[in-house]
């Protein structure tokens, strides 16, 4: 604020410039090579100016420079100067050492009490690094305004998979370090809400479980943790597949958990209604698919995966095995059993058995809404010697086949 006083200038009379600024600040006024300085006490500094005219006024304190005011002094004037100040609140585990850095240099260090609050005196990008028990996490904050309060949450990795946010799981996956923290079969809760195909789910909590770390990475993509849905509990419980009201029945409409609406495997996995309408192929348009019913936090960290499958259908040719890019996918015969009985045997050259199943874990799954009832569940591999069927896992956990228009159990995989 600049204010004019009632004092009048006269020849040989000094003009007063009253500067309101933080106590201890060094105040400087300059004009055409002339400089007047002073130090603020009690929140202000009075400068005696030798002449009228336009003066530039600024202040410094603890290495910080205030805004600069340009004042046209004819009489005596008052001006206010402010220093830039913004707050960054970091939420992180109590006891963590939190360092604030800018341009590679450490600006401040604090110990978190659940939060660590930093006051910064200039704009720019700040890096915050929290360290506890030998583990470090970091994030950045871009400070552009003194009127904004900035916040950052940092999370350490827990060795209990379910205690981690999906974003933390992704960061571990990005670094290719999943196996350093967790084990095959570890579980993470996911609450399903909405409609997938013809099945409406309301607050149904299932547990996604890890089936592979960097599985078949040279083909499918590196730095991925592979999961499958789902189990009924964080420990113990039952392996389940989602089943709609037409389970084990023939259906002639799309939208049920059938591979197709007719008894055909033409076009294989790539063209199946299971892939396009139930699993979904896009993160921007996914209404009615499994992508629509998973938590938003999981949807935000999904990674695409390259899957090779017989995408012709009734074929044993190597050329029939081609790639698709998927977010949710059915497992193949080889990925579950480590061998091919009904699928095109050339699929095996582009696939690998998932660690979860190679370890001998059960392949039997139960109806998610009737957990004492074992169900058949779909695999994405077409039966190579049939124009009508895809491969399935039977109620006893053995491999089989079923015509594509049957609605069966849905137990998809995905990657983070």
Predicted regions span which residues?
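A short, amphipathic beta-strand motif
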Residues: 13-23, 86-92
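Structured interaction patches on ligand/partner-binding surfaces of diverse proteins
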Residues: 40, 60-84, 131-158
């Amino acid at each position: 604020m600049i204010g004019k006083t009632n004092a009048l200038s006269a020849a040989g009379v000094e003009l007063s410039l009253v500067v309101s600024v933080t106590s201890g600040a060094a105040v400087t006024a300059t004009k055409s090579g002339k400089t007047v300085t002073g130090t603020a006490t009690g929140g202000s500094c009075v400068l005696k100016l030798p002449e009228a005219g336009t003066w530039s006024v600024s202040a410094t304190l603890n290495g910080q420079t205030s805004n600069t005011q340009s004042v046209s002094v004819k009489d005596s004037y008052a001006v206010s100067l402010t220093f830039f100040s913004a707050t960054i609140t970091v939420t992180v585990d109590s006891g963590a050492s939190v360092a604030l850095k800018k341009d590679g240099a450490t600006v401040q260090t604090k110990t978190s009490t659940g939060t660590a609050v930093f006051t910064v005196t200039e704009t720019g990008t700040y890096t915050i690094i929290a360290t506890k028990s030998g583990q470090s996490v970091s994030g950045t904050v871009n400070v552009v305004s003194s009127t904004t309060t900035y916040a950052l949450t940092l999370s350490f990795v827990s060795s209990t998979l379910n205690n981690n946010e999906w974003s933390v799981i992704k960061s571990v996956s990005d670094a290719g370090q999943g196996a350093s923290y967790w084990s095959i079969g570890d579980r993470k809760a996911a609450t399903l809400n909405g409609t997938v195909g013809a099945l409406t789910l309301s607050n149904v909590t299932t547990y996604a479980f890890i089936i592979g770390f960097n599985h078949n990475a040279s083909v499918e993509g590196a730095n991925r943790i592979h999961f499958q849905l789902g189990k009924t509990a964080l420990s113990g419980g039952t392996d389940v597949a989602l089943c709609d009201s037409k389970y084990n029945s023939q259906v002639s409409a799309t939208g049920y958990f059938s591979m197709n609406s007719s008894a055909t495997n033409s076009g294989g996995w790539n063209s199946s209604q299971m892939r396009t309408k139930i699993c979904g192929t896009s993160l921007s348009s996914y209404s009615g698919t499994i992508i629509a019913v998973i938590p938003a936090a999981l949807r935000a960290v999904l990674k695409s995966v390259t899957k090779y499958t017989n995408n012709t259908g009734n074929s044993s040719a190597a050329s029939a095995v081609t790639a698709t890019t998927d977010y949710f996918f059915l497992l193949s015969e080889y990925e579950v059993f480590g061998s091919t009985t009904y699928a095109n045997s050339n699929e095996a050259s582009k696939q690998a058995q998932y660690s979860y199943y190679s370890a001998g874990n059960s392949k039997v799954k139960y109806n998610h809404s009737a957990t004492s009832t074992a169900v058949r569940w779909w695999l994405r591999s077409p039966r190579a010697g049939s124009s009508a069927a895809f491969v399935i896992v039977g109620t006893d956990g053995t491999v089989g086949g079923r015509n594509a228009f049957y609605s069966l159990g849905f137990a998809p995989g995905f990657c983070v």
